[in-house]
Amino acid sequence: MTTSETGPILDPLEDLLDVLDLLPVGSAHITVDGPVADEGSDLGGSDADVFIGRSQPMPHGRVFGGQVLAQSVIAAGRTVEDLADAKERPRRIHSLHGYFLRPGDSNHRIRFAVERLRDGHSFSARRVHAIQFGK
């Protein structure tokens, strides 16, 4: 490991592994509003497990989408681990869909809110929101 004016520079592999080590920070309530014109169209909300992670430095200060997907998988996986017992096989990823609605800023942490949509006998479903600046 070497150092720079701003602090230690990690080996790229060490840095990637460090980025994937998310910090659990508790839970939050996520609400979903319907269209503004439709009165009473509030879609309700759900509770979510919340994790925080940082980004690898990237050109132009943007977050690499693959990093966000990997962090989302880690966050979702941490909400499934507690379901497995000694008799049950570990749950593996079967399907992943990602939508990038806004660019991310690599200089700010990302908050991952994981909604537990379903926990059945054979599979679980999760929705992960990657949030910066409240959006």
Residue ranges and their predicted role:
Residues 1-135:
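Terminal targeting signals and extreme-terminal segments of soluble enzymes
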